[in-house]
Amino acid sequence: MQTTGALLISPALIRSCTRGLIRPVSASFLSRPEIPSVQPSYSSGPLQVARREFQTSVVSRDIDTAAKFIGAGAATVGVAGSGAGIGTVFGSLIIGYARNPSLKQQLFSYAILGFALSEAMGLFCLMVAFLILFAM
C-alpha cells in the first residue's frame, strides 16, 4: 500500500499546472511573433512581416474535415425528403381525382404548388450541403 505522503502534491506543482488553465484562449491558441535580436540590413532582401496565426494540429484538421462531411451528409437527407414529398403530392392528386373528377383543375393546381414547394426545400437542402462542403 502507498503512504499518504506519496499521494500529496506540492503547491508549486499545482501552481505550475493551473497556470495554463488560467491563460486566456487567445494567448493559448495564437503563436507569438518572433522578434529578431539583430536588426536586418535593408540591402539583404525584403523585410519579413511578423504574423500571428492559429496553431492547428493534424488531428484537429481531421476532426474538422470529418465534421464537414457529417454535416453535409445530414443536410443531404433533406433531398430524399423532397422526393418523398413529391411522391406524396402526386399520390394525393390521383386519390383526389378518383374521388371527385369534377375538381380536376383545382386539384392539379394544388399539386403543382405542392411539387414546387417540396422541390424548393430539396434544392435548399442540397445548397446547404454544398455550402458546408465548399464554403467552410
Swiss-Prot record:
The keyword Protease does not apply. It is linked to This protein is the major protein stored in the storage bodies of animals or humans affected with ceroid lipofuscinosis (Batten disease). Keywords: CF(0), Hydrogen ion transport, Ion transport, Lipid-binding, Membrane, Methylation, Mitochondrion, Transit peptide, Transmembrane, Transmembrane helix, Transport. It is a multi-pass membrane protein. One of its GO terms (molecular function) is lipid binding. One of its GO terms (cellular component) is proton-transporting ATP synthase complex. The gene is ATP5MC1. Residues 1-61 form a transit peptide. Belongs to the ATPase C chain family. One of its GO terms (biological process) is proton motive force-driven ATP synthesis. The keyword Transmembrane helix applies. Trimethylated by ATPSCKMT at Lys-104. Methylation is required for proper incorporation of the C subunit into the ATP synthase complex and mitochondrial respiration. Subunit c, of the mitochondrial membrane ATP synthase complex (F(1)F(0) ATP synthase or Complex V) that produces ATP from ADP in the presence of a proton gradient across the membrane which is generated by electron transport complexes of the respiratory chain. ATP synthase complex consist of a soluble F(1) head domain - the catalytic core - and a membrane F(1) domain - the membrane proton channel. These two domains are linked by a central stalk rotating inside the F(1) region and a stationary peripheral stalk. The modification N6,N6,N6-trimethyllysine is found at K104. It comes from Ovis aries (Sheep). This is ATP synthase F(0) complex subunit C1, mitochondrial. The chain crosses the membrane at residues 77-97, 112-132. InterPro entries: ATP_synth_F0_csu, ATP_synth_F0_csu_DDCD_BS, ATP_synth_F0_csu_sf, ATPase_proteolipid_c-like_dom, F/V-ATP_Csub_sf. Homooctamer; the c-ring consists of eight c subunits forming a circle, and each subunit adopts a hairpin shape. Component of the ATP synthase complex composed at least of ATP5F1A/subunit alpha, ATP5F1B/subunit beta, ATP5MC1/subunit c (homooctomer), MT-ATP6/subunit a, MT-ATP8/subunit 8, ATP5ME/subunit e, ATP5MF/subunit f, ATP5MG/subunit g, ATP5MK/subunit k, ATP5MJ/subunit j, ATP5F1C/subunit gamma, ATP5F1D/subunit delta, ATP5F1E/subunit epsilon, ATP5PF/subunit F6, ATP5PB/subunit b, ATP5PD/subunit d, ATP5PO/subunit OSCP. PROSITE patterns: ATPASE_C. It is found in: Mitochondrion membrane. Signal peptide: none annotated. There are three genes which encode the ATP synthase proteolipid and they specify precursors with different import sequences but identical mature proteins. It catalyses: H(+)(in) = H(+)(out). The record marks E119 as: Reversibly protonated during proton transport.
